[in-house]
């Protein structure tokens, strides 16, 4: 049916095209014969043909129906013309009915093919067009030509009516298939303007990175229950044959990010050491046998991507490690780590500084433990401090870092809002530091936590390839945390601020084989920085000045006498002194106190200089203009015959009135 509709549409478009061609041809000959009534009707016919063409092309039924109705009227008009030229009834083709009283007739009457008209020169009415008395030798008489034109128009109108009816039937009889607003779906030429509804929403305030981070955080929260169930089943299968050995040596394995697994704590709370608190905010290790140095390897379940290898060393296992107890009166600290640990939802965001970015694991959201994952960005070492620590066989451990400069060294090494002790980065540059919520009370001293044990860090004297100069295990984990036995000692609360080294202007030789004494001598010799080099002015370097020379010798050449005083004779210009303009400016004498009119000068640009606005050429033109006849009617002359200078603010300065 779609192909049929396209065929009907093409048929109607073809009929409209033929009608336009024939009516234009008829309109031209009607203009030549001054037939005004057919001319007006032909204009209307051309207009309705355009309506029909547009309706058939765009499937507009209203335009097609309008074209259909006009075709009936057009057939009636052409029928009248046929009857008029055939003299049917009382109609007479020699009357003035079609020419509207102008007396004109069809152009084909005297200009037909082979026609030879004969005119009567003795015409009575000179205002009417002259008609021939008789015409001989015409191939076709003009009435026959006009009847042929009208018959062709009637035939085309009938075909147009047929095509319009066929297309209108598609619109009127098949409304269930054809959508009036959308038109025929199978016609690619159909173009309809449809209303468009636009909904305005506010601009999102969150960035793309924050949105991606929040989506990842929610996804990890949804996956956490399933991972916990898998890890619980896996640990139950592995810990069943090793339950009798659990009191001697155990180590808790984490998930994919090597964090603390809380499921094993919930299954065996009685097996934990008595000095372990309930918050479980650190990875801990019991005192094992000195000869027990086996390797424990576990996986965190099916979701684990790699195995975590942990090797226990003898010097690490000779002392108990326990996290600092959590006090409800812990002094809050305005540090970056406490801000991250106090708000679990804030820790998931992309808050970071230049060297570290802290991320809290989703595993810590369900329990009370908090872990900060520090993404370390390695940078060149700034300073190394000689740290020495000794182990007592009795279990007492001396702090490897002096209490006064424990935090000051971290402030000196890391110029950030958040800085901790030097930890070794683990795998993929990630270091895990155990924290307590809301703040790690072992790192911040106050009045209410002086009597509590504090965390100290173990070090080694051997060199390390990392920036922190601390050893780390093969698995990438930092050294275990130690607590000294003398935990009741009061720690100082006044920590000195870091000092900034002075600027050393002495050139240091980059000799790698130089001894230590020479390096210390170079470091102790501190001198102030050298003064900046004196650079000549830009005009002195270029050898020229951007402003004109206004030395007294040159200024006298441009001095214009006041109009109130007598006119001075023109002086011979003095020779220009030799040298650059800068040399002449530096050697000039003080200006004489002669009253000079500064109306021709600009005193404001730039400060300290006076720039002349008129040159020698303009002064010569002014002299010639004064000598020439007065032709400028806008500027008058004074009574003395001199040209009056226009008033300006310069007149009030020098005391001259215009």
From Swiss-Prot:
This is Sodium/potassium-transporting ATPase subunit beta-1-interacting protein. The gene is NKAIN. It is found in: Cell membrane. GO terms for cellular component: plasma membrane. Expressed in the brain. Residues 274-308 have a biased composition (Polar residues). Its main location: membrane. The chain crosses the membrane at residues 1-22, 31-51, 64-84, 152-172. Disruption phenotype: Flies are not viable. However, the decreased expression due to gene disruption leads to a temperature-sensitive phenotype with paralysis at 38 degrees Celsius. Residues 322-335 have a biased composition (Low complexity). Interacts with nrv1.
């Amino acid at each position: 049916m779609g192909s049929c509709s396209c065929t009907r549409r093409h048929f109607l478009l073809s009929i409209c095209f033929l009608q336009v061609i024939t009516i234009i041809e008829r309109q031209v000959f009607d203009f030549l014969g001054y037939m005004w009534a057919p001319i007006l009707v032909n204009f209307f016919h051309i207009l309705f043909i355009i309506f029909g063409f547009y309706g058939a092309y765009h499937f507009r039924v209203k335009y097609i129906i309008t074209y259909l109705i006009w075709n009936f009227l057009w057939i009636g008009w052409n029928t009248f013309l046929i009857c008029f030229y055939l003299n049917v009834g009382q109609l007479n083709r020699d009357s003035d009915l079609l020419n509207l009283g102008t007396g004109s007739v069809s152009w084909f009457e005297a200009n037909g093919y082979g026609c030879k008209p004969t005119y009567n020169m003795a015409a009575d009415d000179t205002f009417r067009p002259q008609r021939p008395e008789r015409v001989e030798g015409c191939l076709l008489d003009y009435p026959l030509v006009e009847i042929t034109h009208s018959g062709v128009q009637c035939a085309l109108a009938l075909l147009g009516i047929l095509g319009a009816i066929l297309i209108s039937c598609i619109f009127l009889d098949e409304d269930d298939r054809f959508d009036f607003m959308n038109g025929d779906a199978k016609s690619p030429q159909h173009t309809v303007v449809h209303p468009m509804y636009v909904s305005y929403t506010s601009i999102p305030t969150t960035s793309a990175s924050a949105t991606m981070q929040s989506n990842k955080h929610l996804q990890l929260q949804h996956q956490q229950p399933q991972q916990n169930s898998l890890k619980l089943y896996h640990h139950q299968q592995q810990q069943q044959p090793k339950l009798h050995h659990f009191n001697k040596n155990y180590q808790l394995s984490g998930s994919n990010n090597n964090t603390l697994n809380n499921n094993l704590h919930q299954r065996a709370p009685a097996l934990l050491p008595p000095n372990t608190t309930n918050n479980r905010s650190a990875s801990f290790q019991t005192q094992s046998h000195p000869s027990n140095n086996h390797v424990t390897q576990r996986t965190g379940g099916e979701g684990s991507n790699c195995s975590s290898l942990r090797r226990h060393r003898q010097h690490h296992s000779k002392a108990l490690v326990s996290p600092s107890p959590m006090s409800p009166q812990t002094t809050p600290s305005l540090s970056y780590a406490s801000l991250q640990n106090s708000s679990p939802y804030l820790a998931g965001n992309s808050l970071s500084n230049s060297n570290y970015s802290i991320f809290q694991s989703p595993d810590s959201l369900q329990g009370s433990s908090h872990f900060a994952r520090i993404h370390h960005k390695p940078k060149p070492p700034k300073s190394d401090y000689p740290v020495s620590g000794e182990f007592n066989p009795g279990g007492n451990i001396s702090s490897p870092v002096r209490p006064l400069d424990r935090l000051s060294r971290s402030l000196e090494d890391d110029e950030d809002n958040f800085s901790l002790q030097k930890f070794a980065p683990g795998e993929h540059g990630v270091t895990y530091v155990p924290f307590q919520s809301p703040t790690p009370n072992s790192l911040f001293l106050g009045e209410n936590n002086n009597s509590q044990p504090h965390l100290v860090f173990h070090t080694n004297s051997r060199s390390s390839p990392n920036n922190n100069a601390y050893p780390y295990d093969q698995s990438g984990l930092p050294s275990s945390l130690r607590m000294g036995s003398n935990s009741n000692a009061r720690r100082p609360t006044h920590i000195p601020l870091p000092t900034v080294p002075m600027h050393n202007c002495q050139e240091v030789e980059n000799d790698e084989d130089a001894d230590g004494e020479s390096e210390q001598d170079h470091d102790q010799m501190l001198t102030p920085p050298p003064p900046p080099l004196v650079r000549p002015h830009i005009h002195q370097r270029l050898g020229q000045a951007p402003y004109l020379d206004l030395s007294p010798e040159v200024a006298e050449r441009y001095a214009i006498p006041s109009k109130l005083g007598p006119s001075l004779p023109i002086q011979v210009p003095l020779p220009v002194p030799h040298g650059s303009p800068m040399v002449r400016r530096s050697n000039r004498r003080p200006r004489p106190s002669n009253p000079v009119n500064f109306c021709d000068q600009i005193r404001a640009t730039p400060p300290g200089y006076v720039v002349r606005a008129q040159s020698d050429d303009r002064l010569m033109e002014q002299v010639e203009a004064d000598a020439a006849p007065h032709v400028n009617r806008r500027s008058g002359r004074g009574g003395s015959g001199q040209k009056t200078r226009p008033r300006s603010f310069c007149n009030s300065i020098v005391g001259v009135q215009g």
